[in-house]
Amino acid sequence: MNKDFYISIFGDRYDREAVLFPASVTILLIVFALGNILHGYLEHIDVLDSKVHMTIFAVLILIITKIMMWIIRTLSKNSIERLTYGKEKLNFPTISMLLPSSSILSNEYKNRILLKAQKDFEIDLNTSISNQEDETKVRKVIAEVTNLIRKKVSRLERTETYLIKNIRYGRCRNMIGGSTIAILIQLVITIYSAIKGYSLFCPIISITISCMLDLYMFYIYKQAGIEYAKELF
């Protein structure tokens, strides 16, 4: 398969590991919840009786996966991050760890980052922070600089460690978004199954798995953000 075509369909490494993987897990959890309902429909349809049907089936799976990737990415960035780090994401670790009151990084290391920001972007961040009494304004000043750092890093050849940390953070965030979507859809499936008299085994098991996955990802999400922020600097 042509590399450019492969990337256009499945995305780069970040897209595959941080977005495609959560989307695939979400779809599998939803399909499992639909087990009894799908079985009732599919036993009357020979989906794989020809190459045409197989092609249509494969294309449908691809379309559903791409749509789910977009939904998860959008929901996670606009909802999960804002719920965790505030509306303007001013509590994100890349900002919080540069505050004078933060103990995540040593003062010496923070000063090195501030001096590098002054050298690279001609912004005296140390003075700007010292002159601000309102912490929200301080966070906004730091946010502007960290955005510049992030853009600079994205243009450079990223190290393997940075990419791994970035993927891990993105995957945790998107898994939370994906499992939340799965839970909502599974609840609808459970209600429908109860009304129609289908077995509730598959919906209940899938909801349990999704809830456990959601809780676990929430547990490691903030730590993944801190590790990503440290690697960015």
What is each stretch, according to the model?
Residues 80-158:
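Charge-rich cytosolic interhelical loops and cytosolic tails of multi-pass membrane proteins
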Residues 72, 102, 109-113, 161-177, ...:
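Charged, low-complexity, helix-prone segments enriched in Lys/Glu/Asp/Gln
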Residues 1-107, 198-205, 221:
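N-terminal first transmembrane alpha-helix
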Residues 193-233:
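Alpha-helical oligomerization segments
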Residues 10-27, 148-202:
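Transmembrane alpha-helical segments and their cytosolic interface motifs
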Residues 50, 54, 127, 131, ...:
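Generic, low-specificity signal for short hydrophobic/alpha-helical stretches with a mild N-terminal bias
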